[in-house]
Amino acid sequence: MEAFRTHTGIGVPLRRSNVDTDQIIPAVYLKRVTRTGFEDGLFAAWRNDPSFVLNLPPFDRGSVLVAGPDFGTGSSREHAVWALMDYGFRVVISSRFADIFRGNAGKAGLLAAEVNQNDVELLWKLIEQNPGLEITVNLQDRNIIAGTVMVPFTIDDYTAWRLLEGLDDIGLTLRKQSEIEDYERRRPSWKPRTLPV
């Protein structure tokens, strides 16, 4: 997983609340056996509407999504995070995330930055008044800069550390590779073994 320190990209105002994982990517798009290629399913029902924000330049090139409260509710669908990332989003900003979505995002490398709702409203206003406005998100300092405005965000320390280090679940395991190999060498021969790679 790529480490996340700062990201600068076009802000996209998604003025919707209670966006669940089925709205992010409908189940019909989940039939792949790979972890990539889900961008076509992102907000598929809404993208049929020509006035939907992702159909409008410059928002169609955005990478910082500013969404309403309760983003990512519904089922535990990792594909929702993958679809956002495959489309090009690196950050989702909201005043409230579903716990499972927040966890899936952090494990995949997508920053779920939680701010208060007044700051979401302020960011929406700035983005809509200045289409193409670039937003910088700094994970180390835990702030968002849009024009002359700086907004703090919250994220738990463990998820922030994983993102800063670029550690997904496999990366975390590989940090202990020598200890795992040592354990395997010391196991009794009659117990099952993992095969060397």
From Swiss-Prot:
Its EC number is 4.2.1.33. One of its GO terms (biological process) is L-leucine biosynthetic process. The keyword Amino-acid biosynthesis applies. Pathway: Amino-acid biosynthesis; L-leucine biosynthesis; L-leucine from 3-methyl-2-oxobutanoate: step 2/4. Keywords: Amino-acid biosynthesis, Branched-chain amino acid biosynthesis, Leucine biosynthesis, Lyase. SUPFAM superfamilies: LeuD/IlvD-like (SSF52016). GO terms for cellular component: 3-isopropylmalate dehydratase complex. GO terms for molecular function: 3-isopropylmalate dehydratase activity. Catalyzes the isomerization between 2-isopropylmalate and 3-isopropylmalate, via the formation of 2-isopropylmaleate. Belongs to the LeuD family. LeuD type 1 subfamily. PANTHER family: 3-ISOPROPYLMALATE DEHYDRATASE SMALL SUBUNIT (PTHR43345:SF5), 3-ISOPROPYLMALATE DEHYDRATASE SMALL SUBUNIT 2-RELATED-RELATED (PTHR43345). Heterodimer of LeuC and LeuD. This is 3-isopropylmalate dehydratase small subunit. It comes from Mycobacterium sp. (strain KMS). The gene is leuD.
